[in-house]
Regions:
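Substrate-positioning beta->alpha
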Residues: 164-169, 182-207, 211-214, 225-226, ...
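Mid/C-terminal beta-alpha module of Rossmann-like enzyme folds, strongest
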Residues: 204-280, 297-300, 307-339
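NAD(P)H-binding glycine-rich loop region in Rossmannoid oxidoreductase-like domains
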Residues: 9, 34-88, 92, 98-101
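Conserved Rossmann-fold NAD(P)-dependent oxidoreductase catalytic core, especially the SDR/UDP-sugar
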Residues: 78-134, 142-143, 149
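Conserved beta-loop-beta element that borders a ligand/cofactor-binding pocket
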Residues: 136-160
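A short C-terminal helix-loop "cap" of Rossmann-like NAD(P)-dependent dehydrogenase/epimerase domains
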Residues: 170-182, 237, 273
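N-terminal Rossmann NAD(P)H-binding glycine-rich loop of SDR-like oxidoreductase domains
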Residues: 3-23
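Conserved glycine-rich Rossmann-like NAD(P)H-binding loop of the short-chain dehydrogenase/reductase
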Residues: 26-32
């Protein structure tokens, strides 16, 4: 298969390239060349810009394209319309954030997506990100009706994830000592290893599969306590988990998902089913999940090498999520001293 990937050097795109090359496909990358341009020296690289700089794509043909870097419907529409007669199949990587709320447990792909009062908005914020992704989905499908695969991942984790939303916990548990853990060990969470997502997506592309698929995991109930216990086992650390109540965290202004990644207050009815998304359709289509310990082990190993990356230091080394050490100490002290 002759495959075009829009992006391809940061996170999911990187593993799509690796999976495609491992399966003997011919790969072409289209991006600005700003992130890890030294990767894949034998792969054709077309330089350009999603926003108005698509000239390098004109006059070419591929069997399929995977769009890993679309956030604005205008931009996705431009590439999809340009490629409509040049490719047989278009995959758009979307997000479960397209759903406006998660009040229902087990929400599947039939749930309505979010909308914007002003569909011309192009500022990507926490409020607009999901509806913009939904509009991107529509733009791709309109350009290639019946030939578009829409993948809606949940939280993607693993090596080369600079968001630190999962990496924070892997690193923090490995450091050992008393660790502030949110709420209680039994609350459910969902994640998907970037390599599992990439390999499944590629298999779907090979089959020219169309339609909409939620893609997170695993295929069993995973609790946050399971994640921390696995991190401790893999790193062989002496970490001690102090479970701090949700009420205390809210009262002390702890920011969900940012200061304490993965944690969403259960008191928010709109988020009740956030970690109970149905992925039955994707699993039936062949999505499989590696052992959590493998994800933790590989993430921990990669995190130890971040200083050696060719990414800019601000991106590579500056934590993007998680409690600052002094903030964690302060909160633990307040928790132990409460009356």
């Amino acid at each position: 298969m002759n495959l075009l990937i829009l992006g391809g050097t940061i996170f999911l795109g990187r593993y799509l390239v690796e999976a495609a090359l491992a399966r003997g496909h011919q790969v072409t990358l289209f991006n600005r060349g700003q992130h890890s341009p030294e990767l894949y020296p034998g792969v054709e690289k077309l330089r350009g810009d999603r926003d108005g700089g698509l000239a390098a794509l004109r006059g070419r043909r591929w069997d399929a394209v995977v769009d890993t870097s679309g956030y604005l419907p205008r931009v996705v529409r431009a590439s999809a319309e340009l490629l409509a007669d040049a490719v047989g199949h278009y995959t758009f990587i979307s997000s479960i954030s397209v759903y406006p709320h998660f009040r229902v447990m087990g929400q599947d792909e039939s749930a309505p997506v979010g909308t914007l009062d002003d569909p011309t908005v192009e500022e990507v914020t926490g409020e607009s990100y999901g509806p913009l992704k939904a509009l991107c989905e529509q733009a791709a499908e309109q350009a290639l009706p019946g030939r578009t695969l829409i993948v809606r991942p949940g939280l993607i984790v693993g090596p080369h994830d600079y968001s630190d939303r999962f990496t924070y916990w892997v690193r923090r548990v490995a450091q050992g000592g008393e660790l502030l853990a949110p709420s209680h060990p039994g609350w459910r969470t969902q994640i998907i290893d970037v390599r599992d997502l990439a390999e499944w997506t590629l298999r779907m592309v090979e089959r020219q599969q169309a339609g909409v698929y939620n893609a997170t995991g695993p295929d069993y109930v995973l609790t946050f306590g399971d994640i921390l216990d696995t991190c401790r086992m893999v790193s062989d650390s002496d970490a001690r988990f102090t479970w701090v109540s949700e009420e205390f965290l809210v009262e002390n202004g702890v920011t969900p998902w940012v200061e304490l990644p993965l944690w969403i207050p259960q008191s928010d009815p709109d988020m009740l089913g956030f970690s109970d998304i149905s992925c039955a359709k994707a699993i039936a289509a062949g999505l499989v999940f590696r052992d959590l310990a493998a994800t933790v082990r590989d993430t921990l190993g990669w995190d130890a090498t971040r200083a050696d990356t060719t990414e800019p230091p601000a991106r590579a080394l500056q934590p993007r999520a998680g409690l600052a050490p002094e903030r964690e100490v302060e909160l633990l002290r307040a928790w132990h001293n409460r009356k």
